[in-house]
């Protein structure tokens, strides 16, 4: 009997041991590898676990300078990443009384406290993760760790690592469920490259595998100086095929070309929207020129001019008011770029030329003050394609030889409802020789009285078989152009130089 009892207890112990072992999650791969050298200063830290990873809500990830023992960066996992509910309306919120100043200063997490107001807004007292990106001192909410299956990516605060330093990483128990953590100076070490790229070459390579000058696009853009004087002094950034899950924001850049290896192969994306990174509660944003910058886009080029973006896919991974791309500036050119967002998938303020681009959105898919010239672009939308907000100072949106595909019965070409007591009487939309697919016969949605002076023109719209679209049911404010009577006007709108003034 005693022998049988011992055997039963032994078997039970073995079973419990198996359960305990199965509950443990261990590291099967580190990147950078332990002891790695020649690491880029903008590197993410990734861990591949033995089992699917679940992120915890306690403990910290810490990075130390190995030589001095100085704490370089710390991610406190007890702090929530960002808001999950929209902020309440602020009845006294207003546009900034003076234009927002885009100062060219070296503002980073190393020399400035994230959350420092950059304008007339008040301090944000919310207790969320904050990271200064692209010199925006107010900071962005961010996810310190993102998990996809067995892989964990750790996002250090930007610009904390330096060239020619050796670092070690510690991870507390609780940061990852079922993982005992990582302790000591030898568990995970790496050394960064000795020197920065040669600025005189003006050619930078970004590669997600760490084999380029930078591992992230943000790292490359941070390296490029502000307001380059001429095209001859401009920079070219080549982005290798890869998955770049990063929030990209840069400002004050000029004469920069960002070119991907291929549109399908380069994906730059992040889970961002107006809820996660809202505008300051006391400030209105996005509506008028010179107001406080938006932080809700996955990719934002702010106060930038003479940019070229080519062969990239830009995507937000969130629903709601969520741009895949937000651009503010003049004379910006986009070719073969795929933009994926939800509401306001593309926000374009300032003159932009779009060549052979694809834009996919959920509604008000194209937003902004314009002017924008779309040439051979494809746009899909579940809701209204655009909400144009240009003033009399410039043209609005012009589409030439484009394809608009509706994905629901609500996919009207545009709308102009009153917006919090105001409207856009000078709004302009022109469609020339466009393919319209599954667009409601009425064409346009709501146009309130205060916007009935808007310019809405259409010429030679046809279906996917090349047959003319029946425009008899169009909104009466949508004017159909005649090839003979309106030949001069059609010619003008077909000319990007006339529309964009460059």
Please state what every model-predicted region is.
Residues 19-23:
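Sec/Tat signal peptide C-region and signal peptidase I cleavage site
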Residues 13, 59-61, 260:
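Small side chains
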Residues 2-9:
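Bacterial N-terminal signal peptides that target proteins for export
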Residues 10-17:
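Bacterial N-terminal signal peptides
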Residues 24-197:
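Acidic, low-complexity Ser/Thr/Gly/Pro-rich repeat segments typical of extracellular/periplasmic
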Residues 195-502:
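Sequence-level preference for short, compositionally simple segments enriched
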């Amino acid at each position: 009997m005693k022998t049988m009892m011992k055997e039963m207890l032994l078997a039970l112990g073995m079973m419990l041991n198996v359960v305990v072992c199965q509950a443990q999650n261990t590291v099967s791969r580190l990147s950078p590898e332990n002891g790695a050298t020649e690491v880029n200063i903008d590197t993410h830290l990734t861990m591949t676990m033995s089992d699917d990873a679940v992120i915890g809500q306690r403990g910290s990830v810490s990075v130390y300078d190995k030589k001095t023992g100085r704490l370089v960066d710390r991610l406190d996992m007890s702090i929530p990443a960002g808001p999950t509910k929209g902020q309440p309306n602020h009845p006294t919120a207003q546009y900034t009384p003076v234009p927002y100043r885009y100062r060219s200063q070296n503002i980073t997490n190393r020399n400035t406290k994230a959350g420092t107001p950059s304008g007339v807004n008040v301090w944000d007292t919310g207790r969320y993760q904050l990271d200064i990106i692209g010199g925006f001192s107010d900071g962005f909410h961010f996810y310190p760790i993102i998990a996809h299956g067995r892989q964990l990516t750790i996002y250090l605060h930007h610009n904390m690592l330096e060239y020619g330093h050796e670092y070690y990483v510690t991870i507390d128990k609780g940061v990852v469920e079922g993982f005992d953590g990582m302790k000591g100076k030898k568990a995970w070490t790496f050394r960064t490259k000795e020197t920065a790229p040669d600025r005189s070459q003006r050619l930078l390579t970004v590669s997600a595998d760490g084999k380029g000058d930078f591992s992230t696009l943000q790292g490359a853009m941070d390296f490029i100086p502000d307001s380059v004087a001429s095209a001859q002094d401009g920079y070219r950034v080549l982005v290798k095929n890869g998955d770049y899950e990063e929030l990209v924001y840069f400002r004050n850049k000029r004469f920069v070309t960002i070119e991907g290896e291929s549109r399908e192969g380069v994906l730059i994306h992040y889970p961002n929207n107006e809820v996660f990174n809202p505008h300051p509660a006391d400030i209105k944003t996005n509506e008028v020129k010179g107001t406080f910058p938006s932080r809700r886009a996955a990719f934002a080029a702010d106060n930038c001019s003479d940019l070229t973006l080519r062969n990239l896919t830009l995507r937000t991974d969130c629903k709601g008011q969520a741009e895949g791309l937000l651009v503010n500036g003049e004379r910006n050119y986009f070719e073969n770029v795929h933009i994926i967002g939800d509401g306001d998938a593309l926000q374009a303020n300032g003159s932009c030329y779009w060549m052979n681009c694809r834009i996919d959105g959920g509604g008000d898919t194209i937003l902004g003050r314009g002017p924008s010239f779309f040439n051979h672009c494809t746009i899909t939308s579940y809701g209204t394609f655009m909400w144009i907000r240009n003033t009399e100072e410039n043209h609005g949106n012009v589409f030439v030889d484009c394809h608009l595909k509706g994905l629901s019965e609500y996919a009207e070409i545009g709308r102009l409802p009153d917006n919090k007591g105001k409207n856009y009487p000078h709004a302009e939309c022109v469609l020339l020789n466009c393919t319209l697919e599954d667009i409601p016969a009425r064409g346009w949605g709501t146009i309130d009285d205060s916007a009935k002076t808007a310019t809405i023109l259409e010429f030679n719209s046809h279906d996917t078989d090349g047959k003319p679209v029946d425009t008899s049911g169009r909104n009466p404010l949508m004017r159909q152009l005649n090839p003979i009577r309106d030949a001069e006007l059609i010619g003008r709108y077909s000319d990007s130089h006339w529309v964009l003034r460059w």
